[in-house]
């Protein structure tokens, strides 16, 4: 099985078609959006994916300070897949739950802020991994925040290859009802 492989900031990319290795048996396109404006940007990644990642479909992680990391995944059996579309993001109100929240690069365990969960977000997610690049090498990343339901993601056991994304941690826990800062004793 072969798929088009490319990565780009923006809404489109074109790359060469390369063979996939098991268990990554489907072609896919992932569009990531980091919002809100004025710093919102999108990136697109076309690659070989495992069917477990394809089932994820979409995710919206509230990383705090009214910022979201959103992803849309479209998989197909052809070498080149359609690009997934974003629907508008529904603004919702705080629901009383809290999670650690951060979008961190160059670290697998970034120190977190407090993310105020909204709407149906009652779970906390903690994802860490490496993005493989020719230059400057592996880039570590860590995303923590509120999410509506826990994704079924399996960890990668792949060897290090160029242009690959390697997940090394996916933790999903129940959000807490009170903000952690209120639990600390006032220094008397």
UniProtKB/Swiss-Prot annotation:
One of the Pfam families matching this protein, by short name: PLA2_inh
Lineage start: Eukaryota, Metazoa, Chordata, Craniata, Vertebrata
Stated name of the protein: Phospholipase A2 inhibitor 31 kDa subunit
Organs and tissues of expression: Expressed by the liver.
Compartments reported by the entry: Secreted
Oligomer and partners: Heterodimer with phospholipase A2 inhibitor 25 kDa.
Originating species: Naja kaouthia
Molecular function terms from GO: phospholipase A2 inhibitor activity
Keyword Glycoprotein on entry: yes
């Amino acid at each position: 099985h072969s798929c088009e492989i490319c990565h780009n900031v923006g809404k489109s990319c074109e790359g060469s078609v390369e063979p996939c290795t098991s268990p990554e048996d489907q072609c896919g396109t992932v569009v990531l959006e980091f919002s809100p404006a004025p710093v919102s940007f999108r990136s697109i990644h076309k690659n070989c994916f495992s069917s477990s990642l394809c089932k994820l479909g979409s995710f919206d992680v509230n990383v705090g300070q009214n910022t979201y990391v959103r992803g849309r995944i479209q998989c197909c059996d052809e070498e080149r897949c359609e690009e997934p579309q974003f629907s508008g993001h529904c603004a919702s109100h705080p629901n009383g739950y809290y999670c650690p929240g951060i979008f961190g690069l160059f670290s697998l365990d970034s120190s977190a802020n407090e993310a105020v969960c909204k709407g149906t977000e009652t779970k906390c997610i903690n994802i860490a991994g490496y993005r493989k690049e020719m230059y400057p090498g592996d880039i570590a990343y860590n995303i923590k925040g509120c999410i509506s339901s826990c994704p079924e993601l399996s960890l990668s056991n792949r060897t290090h290859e160029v242009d690959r994304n390697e997940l090394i941690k996916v933790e999903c826990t129940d959000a807490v009802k009170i903000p952690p800062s209120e639990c600390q004793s006032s220094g008397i």
